[in-house]
Amino acid sequence: MRPKAVWEPEYHRVFVDLCVEQTMLGNKPGTHFSKEGWRNILISFQEQTGAMYDRMQLKNHWDTMSRQWKIWRRLVETSFMNWNPESNRFRATDDDWANYLQENPDAGQYRLSVPHDLKKLEILFAGCNVEVKNDEVSGVRKRRRSCYEEEDEDNQSMCSSSNPQTKGYWSPSTHKLFLDLLVQETLKGNRPDTHFNKEGWKTILGTINENTGLGYTRPQLKNHWDCTRKAWKIWCQLVGASSMKWDPESRSFGATEEEWRIYIRENPRAGQFRHKEVPHADQLAIIFNGVIEPGETYTPPSRSRKKLLHNRSESPQWRDTTPLSKMHVDEAETSRQNGCYAESQEDRIDSENAQPLDDMKLMNDVMLQESPVFVEIESAKPMYSIGECIKSLNAIEEVEQGSELYMFALDLFLKREYREIFLELKKPSLRIAWLQRLQSTSFPIPTTT
């Protein structure tokens, strides 16, 4: 079974540009590209991204784009929504939106933002007519789904559903908001172990729906969390590989073309980072602090515990990397039961039943020490010393030495976890924002660790 295509923003951008190019060359005589057009798109896409998607996967993404375009055109061509192409905004009232979304819930994604690359999409879908039915604007839904249908839809995987909302449409701005909320809840202490608690998920769900109007469900957020975690895992393994020569100062790799070729051959999903780093790395470092670290291979605590109990002398199995975060739309091509490379029950750790990291630390340390790559990981791991933190703090001109914020930071440096977060935030402005956030919430002064 071939892997499911996961379309993160950079892949989507490359695909759209290639489609526009072939359209301008006359290789799209109708609603789809000719054989020559698809062949050119496929070859160029693989060369530019390193992702070995096949022709059918590209066609699936084209069909998804086409469906999204019809949703958009139907919305702007509905007279009472009052679309203004000059300002790129709708002048519809809240009641107008409520009525329209009742009949067309998939259009909710466009209430706060227009489609990305709108001008390019207009080129691609020029001449595609969208019928706007008169009864579509009545504000009354003629066919309501039963509660059972809605419940089933909520329980489906984002990847296997044809409904963009059930599938989970994660634009770059929505994904960024999701990460902001994850950071916020992490700093509030609502991620006691590897997953967020009920209070954390409740806050994230309410805030993201209030800001986007998309109506995400909790399973959708957890699914996106899992995929985001997997993307971070791929990145951490990549920067931790000595052959790739990652330089955190220049934020670039020093590996040769041959070294890249060898690494991607063994870790094909790392090809997405061949020409760019993982988006929002500073935020991800905070979110997954203590769970997945650069240079380390992540082993879930539940699995570590089972392995240790079954065979104390057994080295951990270093598993293959897993799919990239769905930061855009993931096409249908189900894998296992629910698609999206769903984790097995053994892999998935329920937040209410997960073993706290503190309790599992000793067992994880033992297992890592048994690994043949442990020495390399340990030698490359930063020390995160108090002296290192103070040196970095003194280098921030905006923070006056002896000020309230400065002294607050010194107190935070007593705890290793905060030293790690502070040093992983590479931008001075981000370090200041993090310190000010903690200070404004009357964060308790940690004890020495």
UniProtKB/Swiss-Prot annotation:
Localization per Swiss-Prot or TrEMBL: Nucleus
Biased composition (Polar residues): 314-324
Domain Myb-like: 162-225
Domain of life: Eukaryota
Gene Ontology CC annotations of this record: nucleus
A Pfam family assignment: Myb_DNA-bind_3
InterPro entries: LIMYB (IPR045026), Myb/SANT-like_dom (IPR024752)
Keywords annotated in UniProt: Nucleus, Transcription, Transcription regulation
Description of the deletion phenotype: Increased begomovirus infection symptoms. Up-regulation of the ribosomal protein genes.
Region (Disordered): 297-324
Tissue note: Expressed in seedlings, leaves, roots, stems and flowers.
Protein task: Transcriptional repressor that associates with ribosomal protein promoters.
Oligomer status and interactors: Interacts with RPL10A.
Protein known as: L10-interacting MYB domain-containing protein
Record organism: Arabidopsis thaliana
Gene symbol of the encoding locus: LIMYB
